[in-house]
Amino acid sequence: MNSSKTDGMDTSTNSYDTLEQLIYQEGIRIKEIDIHPDMDMLLIILNTGGVLQEKLSAYPQLHNASMESLKKYKLIGKGTGIHWPELDEDLSLKGFLRDTIRNQAFGKVK
């Protein structure tokens, strides 16, 4: 049997990976974002009160965009993703959480 699993839901069994289970079972969602190009910072504010921090330069489409374009984002997937229509860029809560966990586990400083 050929599985169609790709870094997320295993569509052959409709099962979620650990991060997706956490996001959906706990109801974790992106509430808003705060962008600071001068500090190379993207803050992801969660409905839980938590804040995730990413380097804007980690995302070339965002890093090279104007502040005007950066402000024109939409939360998608009921707060599980962010879309910038003008930039054709999509980022996910799952990706942010995965990167945060990886960086904390391996002691990387952002």
Model-flagged regions — what are they?
Residues 1-110:
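Motif-centric detector for short Cys/His coordination patterns
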